[in-house]
Curated annotation (Swiss-Prot):
Residues 98-164 form the S4 RNA-binding domain. GO terms for biological process: ribosomal small subunit biogenesis; translation. Part of the 30S ribosomal subunit. Contacts protein S5. The interaction surface between S4 and S5 is involved in control of translational fidelity. The keyword Cytoplasm does not apply. One of the primary rRNA binding proteins, it binds directly to 16S rRNA where it nucleates assembly of the body of the 30S subunit. This is Small ribosomal subunit protein uS4. Keywords: Ribonucleoprotein, Ribosomal protein, RNA-binding, rRNA-binding. One of its GO terms (cellular component) is small ribosomal subunit.
Length: 209
């Protein structure tokens, strides 16, 4: 299955909620979801009552779209989460939160995950001093993520830092914008990922069927 390359705002409208896929634009009056808060298409305004399966499916689709993950990879994340001890919901969230593209976004070096994925793919970041250009790379506690020296003047990175420098970071991360680096201190707790508008338990139930 190919990665979706169409308008990001259509994904928000399809899921019936803001997924904040376009960064700061989502907070402005240019946000398409604010203007048309219904699904795209001729029947988008019609409200449909979802079955339990439909609710579970929508939860899965929403989480996949937030993190930009395709089905095969997302299923692998679930399978890893299910095999680990502890709360499977939290394990699944950790799997997607520790992706390098997500960590770059969370640290504030990109305005959204899509841009973070592109920046990582183009080799603009180091992990523990070594270049990593795989967006799905799994970051470990204690890993240092930094912008490559020759990439520090790239506009998307400079603009993101300017936008995010006064914002609070997630508690499992630390960042030093002056030196263009951050640390993935530890894995997040489920309750700490406060901006994830998804019933993760519904996803677990869907894959457990």
């Amino acid at each position: 299955m190919a990665r979706y390359t169409g308008p990001q705002c259509k994904l928000c409208r399809r899921e019936g909620m803001k997924l904040y896929l376009k960064g700061e634009r989502c907070f402005t009056d240019k946000c398409a979801f604010d203007r048309r808060p219904f699904a795209p298409g001729d029947h988008g305004r019609e409200k449909k009552k979802l079955t339990q399966y439909g609710i579970q499916l929508r939860a899965k689709q929403t989480m996949k779209r937030i993190y930009g993950v395709l089905e095969a990879q997302f299923r692998r994340y679930y399978e890893k989460a299910a095999k680990k001890s502890g709360d499977t919901r939290e394990n699944l969230v950790v799997q997607v939160e520790r992706r390098l593209d997500n960590v770059v976004y969370r640290l504030g070096f990109a305005v959204n995950r899509t841009t973070a994925r592109q920046l990582v793919s183009h080799g603009h970041f180091l992990v523990n001093g070594k270049k990593v250009n795989i967006p799905s790379y799994q970051v470990r506690p204690g890993d240092v993520i930094e912008v490559r020296e020759k990439s520090k003047d790239i506009l998307p990175i400079k603009n993101a830092i300017e936008l995010n420098k006064d914002k609070n970071r997630m508690p499992w991360l630390s960042v030093d914008f002056e030196n263009y680096k951050g640390v993935y201190e530890r894995h997040p707790k489920l309750e700490e990922v406060i901006d994830l508008p998804v019933d993760v338990q519904a996803i677990i139930e869907l894959y457990s069927r």
